[in-house]
């Protein structure tokens, strides 16, 4: 099970990133004392995102974090209401998904269902 992902973000993007992850159901949590001056943490259902404010964040173009949304349509509506631009992903497993850039620049995939075979076009079960 994936426990956490660390994302570098610009120092001026912390509040905006915490708000963004909140739209996806992640809530702020207190980091351990040893790490509080270097990280801001958010969590949902045992999974954590560790936001690491830095002067020059490294943000991959295509690499991304994927999250399963318990209420997919509500999450998309909340993101749209906040002005985020959504990009449709391919329908690789007969379940809608969208991509968005968080305020820190990272690509985030919002999934309506997890990928699981049988894959479309391959039949079977």
Feature locations, PLM:
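N-terminal beta-strand motif that seeds the catalytic metal site of vicinal oxygen chelate
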Residues: 1-18, 63-65, 117-125
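Short hydrophobic/aromatic beta-strand micro-patches
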Residues: 8, 66-70, 101
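Core segments of cupin and vicinal oxygen chelate
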Residues: 8-48
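Short acidic/glycine-enriched loop/turn segments that link adjacent beta-strands
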Residues: 34-38, 59, 92-96
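Short hydrophobic/aromatic beta-strand element in the GNAT-like acyltransferase core
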Residues: 39, 48, 66, 97-99, ...
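Short, charged/polar, Gly/Pro-enriched secondary-structure boundary elements
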Residues: 47-50, 59, 105-108
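Mid-chain, well-packed structural core segment of small domains
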Residues: 63-90
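Vicinal oxygen chelate
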Residues: 82-125
């Amino acid at each position: 099970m994936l426990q956490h992902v660390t994302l570098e973000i610009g120092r001026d993007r912390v509040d905006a990133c915490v708000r963004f992850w909140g739209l996806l159901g992640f809530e702020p949590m207190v980091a351990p004392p040893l790490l509080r001056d270097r990280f801001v943490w958010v969590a949902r259902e045992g999974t954590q995102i560790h936001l690491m404010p830095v002067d020059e964040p490294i943000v991959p173009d295509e690499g991304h974090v994927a999250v399963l949304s318990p209420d997919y349509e509500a999450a998309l509506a909340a993101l749209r209401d906040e002005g985020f631009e959504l990009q449709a992903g391919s329908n690789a497993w007969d379940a809608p998904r969208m991509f968005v850039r968080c305020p820190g620049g990272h690509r985030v995939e919002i999934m309506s269902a997890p990928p699981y075979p049988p894959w479309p076009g391959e039949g079977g079960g």
